[in-house]
C-alpha cells in the first residue's frame, strides 16, 4: 500500500507516518486485504500552485479526504510530481487503497485523475520579472514582502547560488533592509579570513549554475561569522533536528543582508535567518529559494508574496527546461494532449482474466 502526504507544504509528516504504520499493522493482522488502484496522468504542473490550503490542489485533496472519511478507503493519495525531474516515469498520479474493494478503488482513482486533468489550467502561475517584483515590493506599505525565487530552490535540486534576484536587489539601492540566502563557499572563505567588521571586495554567487547565473561584484561588510549550524523550529521540515550547511557568513551590502553558506540549506523556515541575527519580520524584502514549502511559515509573516521569474534549473517556466526523457506527449510541453482515465487499469484487467 502507498500512503502519501495530504499537505503541501508538507506539515503532516508525523500524521502520515502514523497513518501508514496503522495501516501496515492492520494488514499484518489480517484486518485489511489491500486493493490498490493507480492512475498516471500525462501532465506536469508547477509546484508554485500546488498548496493544499487553497486553489486547485486544495480542492482535489478535499475530495481525497472525503473519500477516506465516507467510502471506507484506507488511503487516497494525489501526487503532483516533482516537475523538474527528467525521467521516463514523469507524470502526475493518483493512488487509492481500499480494503479488498477493487472496484471502488478503480472508480475513485479514475474520478480523481479525471478531476485533476480537468483542472490542469488552474495550476498555471503568473511569474514576475525580478526588477518588477522588487518595485512592487517597495510600493507596499510595511513588510515583509516575500519574493519566491523558485528557479533556484534549494529543496528542488537547484544549487542555491543564483544572482537572478540578488543583482537587481543590489542595484535597487534600497533604503530599507532586505535578506537573501546564497550558497557560495568561496565568499564564506573570504569572509572568515577577513573577520567580523572587515570590508571585503569579491564576486559573489554564480559558482555552480553558470548557465543561468553570473557572479556579482560587491563591496561588503562582514556582519557575522558562524559555523553554519542551526535548528529548524517550524512544523514540517526537519523540525528540531540540527542541520549544518558548512561555515556561514552574513555579508552586508548597503541594506541587503546576504546570508552565505558553504553548502545548501532549505530556506522554508525563517529560523535560517534568525539563527544568523536576521529577523525576517523586520525586513522589507525577504528572498526565499522555494516554490511553495515556505508558505507554511512565511504566510503568517508576509505582507505579500511574489513569485519571481528568473532562469534556473527548477524554474516554474516548464517550457524553459531541457526535458529529454519525459514521456511525450505531455501537458503543458505539447499541444493537443488528451486524457481520460480508464474505468479499470490494465493490471486489474489482466488479473481478472487470469482468474476467469
Predicted regions and their residues:
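Generic secondary-structure signature for well-ordered alpha-helical cores
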Residues: 7, 22-33, 62-73, 99, ...
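Accessory alpha-helical/coil subdomains and C-terminal extensions
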Residues: 32-36, 45-132, 139
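Short glycine/threonine-rich loop-to-helix capping motif typified by GTGT followed
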Residues: 49-56, 136-138, 154-166, 191-196
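Extended hydrophobic packing segments that form well-structured cores
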Residues: 94, 114-117, 229-356
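Short, glycine-/Ser/Thr-/acidic-enriched flexible segments
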Residues: 99-102, 151-154, 184-187, 256, ...
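Non-transmembrane, aqueous-exposed alpha-helical and coiled segments at domain scale
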Residues: 139, 144-145, 152-155, 238-239, ...
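Acidic, Ser/Thr-rich peripheral helices and adjacent loops at domain boundaries
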Residues: 185-231, 306-313
Amino acid at each position: 500500500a502507498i500512503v502519501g502526504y495530504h499537505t503541501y507544504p508538507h506539515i503532516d509528516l508525523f500524521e502520515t507516518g502514523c497513518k501508514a504504520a496503522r495501516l501496515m499493522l492492520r494488514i499484518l493482522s489480517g484486518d485489511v486485504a489491500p486493493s490498490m488502484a493507480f492512475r498516471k496522468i500525462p501532465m506536469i504542473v508547477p509546484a508554485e500552485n500546488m498548496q493544499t490550503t487553497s486553489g486547485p490542489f486544495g480542492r482535489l485533496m478535499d475530495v481525497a479526504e472525503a473519500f477516506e472519511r465516507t467510502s471506507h478507503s484506507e488511503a487516497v493519495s494525489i501526487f503532483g510530481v516533482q516537475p523538474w525531474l527528467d525521467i521516463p516515469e514523469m507524470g502526475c498520479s493518483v493512488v487509492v487503497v481500499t480494503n479488498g474493494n477493487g472496484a471502488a478503488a478503480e472508480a475513485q482513482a479514475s474520478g480523481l485523475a479525471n478531476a485533476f486533468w480537468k483542472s490542469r489550467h488552474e495550476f498555471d502561475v503568473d511569474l514576475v520579472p525580478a526588477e518588477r517584483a522588487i518595485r512592487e515590493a517597495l510600493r507596499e506599505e510595511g513588510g515583509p514582502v516575500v519574493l519566491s525565487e523558485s528557479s533556484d530552490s534549494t529543496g528542488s535540486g537547484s544549487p542555491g547560488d543564483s544572482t537572478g534576484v540578488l543583482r537587481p536587489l543590489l542595484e535597487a539601492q534600497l533604503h530599507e533592509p532586505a535578506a537573501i540566502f546564497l550558497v557560495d563557499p568561496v565568499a564564506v572563505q573570504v569572509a572568515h579570513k577577513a573577520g567580523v567588521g572587515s570590508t571585503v571586495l569579491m564576486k559573489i554567487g554564480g559558482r555552480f549554475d553558470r548557465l543561468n547565473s553570473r557572479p556579482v561584484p560587491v563591496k561588503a561588510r562582514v556582519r557575522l561569522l558562524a559555523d553554519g549550524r542551526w535548528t529548524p523550529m517550524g512544523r514540517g521540515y526537519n523540525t528540531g533536528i540540527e542541520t549544518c550547511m558548512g561555515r556561514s557568513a552574513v555579508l552586508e551590502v548597503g541594506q541587503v543582508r546576504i546570508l552565505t553558506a558553504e553548502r545548501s540549506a532549505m530556506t522554508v523556515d525563517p529560523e535560517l535567518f534568525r539563527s544568523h541575527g536576521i529577523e525576517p519580520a523586520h525586513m522589507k524584502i525577504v528572498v526565499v529559494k522555494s516554490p511553495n514549502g515556505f508558505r507554511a511559515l512565511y504566510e503568517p509573516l508576509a505582507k505579500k508574496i511574489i513569485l519571481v521569474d528568473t532562469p534556473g534549473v527548477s524554474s516554474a517556466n516548464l517550457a524553459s527546461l531541457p526535458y529529454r526523457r519525459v514521456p511525450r506527449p505531455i501537458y503543458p510541453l505539447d499541444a493537443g494532449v488528451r486524457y481520460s482515465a480508464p474505468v479499470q487499469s490494465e493490471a486489474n484487467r489482466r488479473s481478472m482474466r487470469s482468474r476467469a
